[in-house]
A protein has these predicted regions:
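Flexible, glycine/charged-enriched surface loops at secondary-structure junctions
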Residues: 20-25, 192-204
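Residue-level signature of catalytic and energy-coupling elements of molecular machines
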Residues: 72, 123, 205
Length: 217
């Protein structure tokens, strides 16, 4: 798929997607093939920073100590300082935090304490602070660039089933913006598959309520 093909697909989607009383998400659906998920090298897990946000604001949390507290407080949506970690040994409170938060930024020198407190809750939900997304940072780091980057970042994850469904845009974005995000995600996916395009069975683009439009790849 090149950028022109991506734009053509978006145009086709516009033709079939009916207007609703709400702004619909636009999802990329990829069916994979010839992958053995028992092999670690066949498990798909990476992050893509798209050219544009998907249109949905990401809720960003920070797990820090005094070194980053003021910086995190000025940038992130919720900040849990080290001295409050014990409060989140309450499973209900920890689960509520995990549910509302898309990404967690963590201070690197307290990762052991973060893992001990939050690992059992965030780990199964794939929300532990992840170095692959740049979410584990040194003390005194400026967080605004990372916060802005995470607003455009999605996780591509397939460990058990050979299908991906990723929210890459909203219908109120321009065709060019949607196409740029589509191309960026697909291009990165191809380069993370062991057999590249040969691991792709089919690709579709759809809005929340529309029928899927096939992408020729």
């Amino acid at each position: 798929m090149d950028k022109k093909q991506a734009l053509d697909v978006v145009h086709n989607l516009r033709k079939v997607a009916k207007q609703r009383k709400f702004v619909q998400a636009i999802d990329l659906v990829v069916n994979l093939q010839d992958l053995d998920f028992k092999k670690p090298e066949h498990q798909i897990d990476f992050y893509v920073t798209m050219p544009y946000s998907s249109g949905k604001k990401k809720f960003i949390g920070a797990l820090v100590d005094a070194d980053l507290f003021e910086e995190a407080k000025s940038v992130c949506d919720i900040v849990i300082p080290l001295h409050q970690f014990d409060d989140y040994k309450d499973k209900k409170k920890a689960k509520k935090l995990a549910k509302r938060t898309d990404f967690f930024i963590a201070q690197s020198n307290i990762m052991t304490k973060i893992a001990a407190t939050f690992g059992r809750t965030l780990g199964p939900k794939n929300k532990m602070p992840n170095p692959k997304a740049g979410c584990v940072v040194a003390p005194k780091t400026s967080l605004k660039p990372l916060y802005d980057k995470l607003q455009k970042t999605i996780r591509v994850l397939a460990r058990n089933k050979p299908i991906l469904q990723l929210c890459i845009a909203r219908e109120d974005m321009t065709d060019e913006q949607v196409a740029d995000n589509l191309y960026a995600v697909y291009d990165q996916l191809i380069h993370h598959l062991p057999k590249e395009r040969n691991n792709v069975k089919s690709v579709f683009l759809k809005t929340t309520m529309s029928q899927p439009v096939k992408v020729e790849v």
